[in-house]
Design a protein with these regions (language model features):
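Cleavable N-terminal export/targeting peptides
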Residues: 1-22, 233
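Outer-membrane beta-barrel transmembrane domain signature
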Residues: 52, 63-64, 130-139, 143-237, ...
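Solvent-exposed loop/turn segments connecting transmembrane beta-strands
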Residues: 31-40, 55-60, 71, 104-106, ...
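Transmembrane beta-barrel strands of outer-membrane/channel proteins
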Residues: 23-29, 48, 57-59, 79-85, ...
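Repeated loop/turn-to-beta-strand initiation elements of outer-membrane beta-barrel proteins
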Residues: 21-23, 52-56, 75-77, 120-124, ...
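Flexible, solvent-exposed coil segments and beta strand-coil junctions
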Residues: 22-28, 43-47, 91-94, 116-123, ...
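Short glycine/proline- and aromatic-enriched beta-strand/turn motifs that initiate or cap beta-hairpins
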Residues: 20-65, 166
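Internal, conserved structured core segments that host functional sites
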Residues: 89-134
Length: 250
């Protein structure tokens, strides 16, 4: 269930403005989405730019590679690709009674994102659309950095994601071949995925130890809509997140 880092990664999106030109590593724990026991994750962090090209990790779906096609004082429009979009769900990671599912794989996804600074209370807003072979989603986030001291920055944020029916059906749907299979006796019904959403709030703190080293902490909560949480392979509809990270800034 390695792709649960996507939930963790959503918190890093809100703080990219304070992590530009950085690499690092994060560690986080979450409430399981699926019926599995794995709830701790290592999250690579990277934010590197050259001219208008960029590589970012710790974003909503891990690694993204892109290009800023428009860049003005108050907005940036970018195109990017995500080699590992979606979720990786392995039946071997599932709890007893749920191991009869077929594996779900990550897929190449493409996206477009508009970052807009409305010049109101130092807010930052982001709107993105991402799509791949197994469907896609629309993302919206709003955040504001608070510079508590010269070394400490705190960034609260709200994030909303809308998933189309193809995406939900592939990653959370249950087809007849997965019902009551050996190892999957607790899956007794099929489930057809429909369009769904999740909404989350989070807060990230970044403490700069010196010019190059920062320590980060983050926490948040995400609520999944019933179109996801009612799936037989989903365990929780509220996902809690807690973690920390170490960042090196160039």
């Amino acid at each position: 269930m390695k792709r649960k880092i996507t939930i963790l990664g959503a918190l890093f999106v809100i703080a990219q403005s304070i992590m530009a030109g950085s690499i690092g590593v994060g560690y986080g724990v979450t409430t399981p989405i699926y019926h599995n026991d794995k709830n701790d994750y290592i999250l690579p962090i990277v934010d590197v730019e050259y001219d208008k090209f960029f590589i970012k990790g710790g974003s909503t779906y891990g690694l993204s590679l892109g290009y800023r096609i428009l860049e003005e004082d108050n907005y940036v429009l970018s195109l990017y690709g995500m080699p590992f979009g979606g979720y990786e769900v392995k039946n071997s990671d599932m709890k007893y009674g749920y191991k009869g599912i077929e594996d779900r794989d990550t897929h190449l996804m493409g996206g477009i994102e508009l970052t807009y600074y409305p010049n109101i209370y130092n807010l930052q807003t982001k709107v993105a659309a991402e799509y791949g072979e197994e469907g896609g989603h629309f993302n919206f986030s709003i955040s504001r950095p608070y510079h508590i001291t010269s070394n400490l920055t705190v960034v609260p944020a709200i994030n909303y994601v809308f998933y189309d029916s193809n995406f939900v059906d592939y990653y959370f749907g249950v087809n007849p071949n997965e019902v009551r299979k050996p190892g999957g006796e607790k899956i007794i019904n099929t489930f057809n995925g429909k369009s769904a959403h999740r909404i989350g709030v989070g807060i990230l703190g970044n403490y700069r130890v010196n010019d190059n080293i920062s320590i980060m902490g983050f926490t948040g909560v995400t609520k999944l809509s019933g179109e996801i949480s009612n799936s037989p392979i989903v365990e929780n509809d509220v996902i809690y997140i807690l973690g920390t990270g170490l960042i090196y800034t160039f």
